[in-house]
């Protein structure tokens, strides 16, 4: 794994302007998180699970952080579960009007004068481009934010909660428990939905495909992956320095690694927050690749 080690060092030189620090063994992930937290301020929480070795790395993993747009794969998983039960149809057309549009809706704002969008198109838009109106329409199809919370409880997640709609849910006020999760809960739920028995094989494949096609995440974990590694992910961002990503990563010829990274309560720039996640991603590659 010498090539990955060199890749990790090169990435840190690129994103920080310094050589990779001397970090011991498995602590490379946690030390990288602590260094990023010290530099950015606020809090960073992670939960990483190598499903092949069953090793875990947690830091502030049971502290609450704003969900932001990381709720979107969970919402679409709830839709897929409803489709399996016969309560929804993937190709049902949802009509909407200009008054339904909210900030950052790159797909739905171009379709508002058409006959609407299918449930499948809405999930694709809200996961791959983080379209906020599409996210709201998916939530509406479920019965609102509380219905997503109820779904999370059915899969064993007693922590994650959604209370508001886009874009209010991105407020991220420190200490506000609304619209929050913990890194541990988010990682476990993602693993359950992409690998567990909650969804059928076909639904798991569909959710994975949507997340693999994420088009707004290149500067984060994807920038840290060597050639041949696969990733399915979803990012989030909000007020008070909130930035997040949930992901499943497949090293070549290995079992997947589940990752949840959340940050909050900092004054760092958007680019600096992205850089920190890329650094943590490089540390994860360095650790699980050995």
Model-inferred region functions:
Residues 26-39, 52, 140-141, 145-146, ...:
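Structured C-terminal helix/loop/strand segments within mature extracytoplasmic catalytic/sensor domains
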Residues 51, 90-107, 142-143, 210:
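Acidic helix-start/capping segments at beta-turn-to-alpha-helix junctions
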Residues 45-49, 58, 74, 95, ...:
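Soluble periplasmic/extracytoplasmic beta-strand elements of cell-envelope proteins
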Residues 40-65, 88:
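Short, conserved catalytic-motif segment at the N-terminal edge
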